[in-house]
Amino acid sequence: MKQFENVNVELEGNSYFDGAVTSRTVNFPDGSRKTLGFMLPGEYEFGTAAAELMEITSGELDVKLPGSDEWLSIKGGESFNVPADSKFQVKVKRVTDYCCSYL
């Protein structure tokens, strides 16, 4: 199991889509941050400010990345990248845990 050490976790969570997607921000000593969260089954669209690496730790979803009309299947243990200043769509098939790194 992967774990982070010497970090600060923000107590207040981030909640989207009436609580169907939630996360907590993890701040690292070097100033970087990640969010750890989960998504309930459903369809969602997200916007990015910074580029992101989305690591799916468990669950299953389909993602449609910016500039593509193709849906990609992603399962626990897989990841995908999203460019800055863009939008992407997901269809979550079952409860999905994720780690989002801001690049």
From Swiss-Prot:
It holds the Pfam family Ppnp. It catalyses: a purine D-ribonucleoside + phosphate = a purine nucleobase + alpha-D-ribose 1-phosphate; adenosine + phosphate = alpha-D-ribose 1-phosphate + adenine; cytidine + phosphate = cytosine + alpha-D-ribose 1-phosphate; guanosine + phosphate = alpha-D-ribose 1-phosphate + guanine. The keyword DNA damage does not apply. Its EC number is 2.4.2.1, 2.4.2.2. It is an enzyme of class 2 (transferase). Disulfide bonds: none annotated. The keyword Transferase applies. It comes from the Bacteria. GO terms for cellular component: cytosol. GO terms for molecular function: guanosine phosphorylase activity; purine-nucleoside phosphorylase activity; thymidine phosphorylase activity; uridine phosphorylase activity. Keywords: Glycosyltransferase, Transferase. Belongs to the nucleoside phosphorylase PpnP family. Catalyzes the phosphorolysis of diverse nucleosides, yielding D-ribose 1-phosphate and the respective free bases. Can use uridine, adenosine, guanosine, cytidine, thymidine, inosine and xanthosine as substrates. Also catalyzes the reverse reactions. This is Pyrimidine/purine nucleoside phosphorylase. The gene is ppnP.
